[in-house]
């Protein structure tokens, strides 16, 4: 894989626009559409293969299968389907059908009750239809975008938490999915923090995944569900956005692997992007009085989990609290301003191993 250029993919919005354009052309030409060229929001021309092409009286239905490229995307393979009827009105009426979420909470830039088709894809879909209508006797259209299986796909997203119910969102600012990019996930992290702020929440909990989020909810049962935000590997994005949105208190909950990377100053913690620095962990161990032979054992450990096992056996579990202290301090420095940060380390069963509460650069540690 070294040196191989990763393949770009296309967003649900781009595929929806292509399907809508194909359905419009089918109505105007009356001939099967095998391929359709569209203009993405970033003005790039792309040729899409049309999977479904069906004409029934005044209604045409076409679909395009999403290829996410080399991006690990739960909507890869989704069949974005457009059902179109042409009208004489000077308006394109767009709605979501089966498998497209409905907005039920404020703070998303869409009206409550509206289909979760974001503004840029919405504009792109309409533009592609109007492009086809030029020179025809029709001025508008009624369009329904649907995604077979969208409800199941949505279970792997943050949609329900954000108040997007019943399916996936039709997304994309450029039309392109960058392979393994930060773009899509970073956008969801930022959006979740903005929504928490919109609802008056001033304490958020940044977790590194589904398990740590569940454990965090058990540890902090009095917090609103919207307080809990999975940041994955992008802790730095979570911290910076917390500052931007004036969040009063940011709590980090994770396991030893990710927290050890944060303690080393790594704010993008993908396991392939950086490894745990066991030399750093052995230095921490020495700073709290761990015997040299144990410190050497820690330095030679294979993984952060292995370090935890060594500390448990040797009776020096206090290292977990020290790691939490350093994480809070490093995240505070990354924030670049005065922000209160707490850090909790849990094990793989959710047991609390260490914590640092209410660290602030102005007051230091309050354990």
UniProtKB/Swiss-Prot annotation:
Entry's EC annotation: 2.1.1.195
Coiled-coil annotation reads none
In the record, biological process GO terms are: anaerobic cobalamin biosynthetic process; methylation
Q: Does the record's keyword annotation contain S-adenosyl-L-methionine?
A: yes
Q: According to its UniProt record, in which pathway does this protein act?
A: Cofactor biosynthesis; adenosylcobalamin biosynthesis; cob(II)yrinate a,c-diamide from sirohydrochlorin (anaerobic route): step 6/10
Q: What class of enzyme is it?
A: transferase
* InterPro entries in UniProt: CbiD, CbiD_sf
Q: Which UniProt keywords apply?
A: Cobalamin biosynthesis, Methyltransferase, S-adenosyl-L-methionine, Transferase
Statement: the UniProt record of this protein carries the keyword Methyltransferase: yes
Please, which domain of life does this record's source organism belong to? Bacteria
Its catalytic activity? Co-precorrin-5B + S-adenosyl-L-methionine = Co-precorrin-6A + S-adenosyl-L-homocysteine
An example molecular function term from Gene Ontology annotations: cobalt-precorrin-5B C1-methyltransferase activity
The record's NCBIfam families line, in alphabetical order, gives: cbiD, PRK00075.1-1
Give the record's family classification. Belongs to the CbiD family.
Q: What is this protein called?
A: Cobalt-precorrin-5B C(1)-methyltransferase
Question: Source species, please?
Answer: Leptospira interrogans serogroup Icterohaemorrhagiae serovar Lai (strain 56601)
Tell me the organism's taxonomic lineage: Bacteria, Pseudomonadati, Spirochaetota, Spirochaetia, Leptospirales
């Amino acid at each position: 894989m070294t040196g191989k250029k990763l393949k770009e993919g296309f967003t649900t919005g781009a595929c929806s626009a292509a399907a809508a354009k194909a359905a419009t052309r089918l109505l105007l030409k009356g001939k099967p559409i095998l391929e359709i060229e569209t203009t993405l929001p970033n003005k790039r021309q792309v040729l899409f293969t049309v999977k479904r092409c069906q004409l029934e009286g005044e209604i045409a239905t076409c679909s395009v299968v999403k290829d996410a490229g080399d991006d690990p995307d739960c909507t890869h393979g989704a069949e974005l389907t457009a059902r179109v009827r042409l009208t004489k009105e000077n308006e394109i009426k767009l709605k979501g059908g089966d498998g497209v979420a409905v907005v039920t909470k404020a703070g998303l830039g869409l009206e409550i009750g509206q289909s979760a088709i974001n503004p840029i894809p919405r504009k792109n879909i309409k533009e592609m239809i109007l492009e086809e209508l030029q020179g025809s006797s029709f001025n508008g259209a009624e369009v329904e975008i649907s995604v077979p299986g969208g409800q199941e796909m949505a279970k792997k997203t943050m949609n329900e938490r954000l108040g997007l119910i019943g399916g996936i969102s039709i997304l994309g600012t450029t039309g392109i999915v960058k392979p393994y990019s930060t773009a899509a996930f970073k956008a969801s992290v930022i959006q979740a923090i903005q929504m928490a702020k919109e609802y008056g929440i001033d304490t958020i909990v940044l977790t590194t995944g589904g398990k740590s989020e569940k454990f965090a909810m058990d540890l902090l049962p009095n917090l609103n569900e919207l307080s809990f935000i999975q940041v994955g590997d992008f802790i730095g994005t979570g911290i910076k956005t917390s500052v931007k949105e004036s969040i009063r208190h940011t709590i980090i909950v994770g396991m030893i692997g990710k927290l050890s990377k944060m303690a080393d100053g790594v704010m993008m913690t993908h396991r392939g992007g950086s490894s745990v620095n066991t030399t750093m962990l052995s230095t921490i161990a020495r700073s709290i009085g761990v015997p040299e032979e144990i410190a050497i054992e820690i330095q030679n450990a294979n993984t952060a989990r292995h370090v935890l096992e060594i500390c448990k056996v040797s009776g020096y579990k206090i290292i977990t609290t020290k790691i939490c202290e350093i994480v809070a301090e490093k995240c505070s420095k990354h924030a670049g301003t005065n922000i209160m940060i707490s850090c909790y380390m849990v094990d793989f069963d959710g047991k609390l191993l260490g914590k640092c509460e209410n660290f602030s650069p102005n007051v230091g540690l309050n354990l």
